[in-house]
Amino acid sequence: MTAEEIKKKDSEYIMHTYGRFDIVLDQGKGATLWDADGKQYVDLTSGIGVNSLGHGNPAIVNAVTKQAEKLMHASNL
């Protein structure tokens, strides 16, 4: 999907409870992000997990992958 297609679906299906940046992020590594057009950003706005661990930390990716292979989700209901 193109960035414009993603933005259109976002406006149709996502409740906008807070302001958003007008970008479509594609990938991240450490504190660096890239949008769907390949433009690079330094991530100064993400949540606490990214602030302390960075995007794409190999140890975290490995741990999450291993856990997801065993159990993806367990409801507390």
Residue ranges of predicted features:
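Active-site and channel-lining beta-strand-loop segments
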Residues: I23-D43
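Glycine-rich loop-to-alpha-helix module at the N-terminal edge of alpha/beta enzyme cores
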Residues: Q40-L77
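Short hydrophobic/aromatic-rich motifs at helix boundaries and adjacent loops
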Residues: T2-A3, T32-D37, N57-A63
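Active-site-adjacent loop/helix segments that line or gate small-molecule/cofactor pockets in enzymes
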Residues: M1-K29
